[in-house]
Amino acid sequence: MARINPNKLYVQDVTLRDGMHSVRHQYSLDAVRAIARALDRAHVDAIEISHGDGITGSTFNYGFGAHDDTEWIAAVAGECKFSRITVLLLPGIGTVHDLKYACEAGARSVRVATHCTEADVSRQHIEAGRKLGMDTVGFLMMAHMAPVEKLVEQALLMESYGAECVYVTDSAGALLPKQYAERVKAVRGALKPETEIGVHTHHNLTLGVANAVAGIEAGAVRVDASLAGMGAGAGNAPLEALIAVLDRMGIETGCDLHMLMDAADDLVRPLQDRPVRVDRESLSLGYAGVYSSFLRHAESASKLYGVDTRDILTELGKRRMVGGQEDMIVDVALDILKSHGAEAAQ
């Protein structure tokens, strides 16, 4: 699906999808309508809406959502005249049938997300997105965990399946600007000129905006961000801050900065039951290279078993756990508790 203005940076908001993690997937329909309406009026190119772990992510493992994905999608679609409605789909969680239902509810773009070494599982879903006439994107998560050459190989696979854009996704907020730029530049250089590159950053090391800018300078033309940084861990690149920086750089976005500031402070921040910020727990995510959405699961395990959240996250990083292994968080907490008991007995 061709973009309306291919010469302008494409701004993809993720407040209503990645931000789901911040509220344990409990956005009300009224809340998503109000936020979508504000984003649409501010002329954000696209708005992603679904369970934090993608369509059909509402499960015991990831957390149950307040509403069905199609309800959320339809609510957002009903408010938008300008912005394209986007969904996230993780193969193994969401299916082709789920994607069809999302499209019927109003979604016009899909990002098919896999771990950065598992692009081969995305073929069926990327092909389905193209057949449905959707803007179809490949989304390589946890990009810090693969060498540059491997990342390029996986991006080429997604492109060969029909992806019109491939994202280099720093799901853990673990990359430094130079490292991120290196990955984006390599992927940009390997793919066809017409295949776009996107960047998705997290703020766990306070580098969300800096990494987004580094990725844009390295060749990305799509960028993710969220109002007030609403997202997993310490959040994503704050949309209003990113737009301000890009404006200072002379990069056209077409977004209304003041409207975004108002939406961030008036609509989004009041919904946070846990502040989305860099603190000892979220900083540990970036430092240990752990999937950002593990934060609230790890905090729950910490409270239940009396183990420091940082210890849980550090051990998850050592074990190289990735998205989809949320069930291992409790195992790690119990192992730490057991080791503490053994130490006390000595």
UniProtKB/Swiss-Prot annotation:
The site (Transition state stabilizer) lies at: 17
Which reaction(s) does the protein catalyse, per the Swiss-Prot or TrEMBL entry?
Answer: (S)-4-hydroxy-2-oxopentanoate = acetaldehyde + pyruvate
InterPro entries in the cross-refs: 2-IPM_HCS-like (IPR050073), 4OH_2_O-val_aldolase (IPR017629), Aldolase_TIM (IPR013785), DmpG_comm (IPR012425), DRE_TIM_HOA (IPR035685), PYR_CT (IPR000891)
**Record has Chaperone as a keyword:** no
Kindly list the positions annotated as binding substrate: 17-18, 171, 200, 291
The catalytic site is made up of: 21
Matching entries from Gene3D superfamilies are given as:
1.10.8.60, Aldolase class I
GO BP annotations listed: catabolic process; L-leucine biosynthetic process
Top-tier EC class: lyase
Binding of Mn(2+) occurs at: 18, 200, 202
EC numbers, comma separated? 4.1.3.39
A GO molecular function term, named singly, is: 2-isopropylmalate synthase activity
Matching Pfam families, A to Z?
A: DmpG_comm, HMGL-like
Chain ranges of the Pyruvate carboxyltransferase domain: 9-261
Q: Which UniProt keywords apply?
A: Aromatic hydrocarbons catabolism, Lyase, Manganese, Metal-binding
Q: Which family does it belong to?
A: Belongs to the 4-hydroxy-2-oxovalerate aldolase family.
- Official protein name in the record: 4-hydroxy-2-oxovalerate aldolase
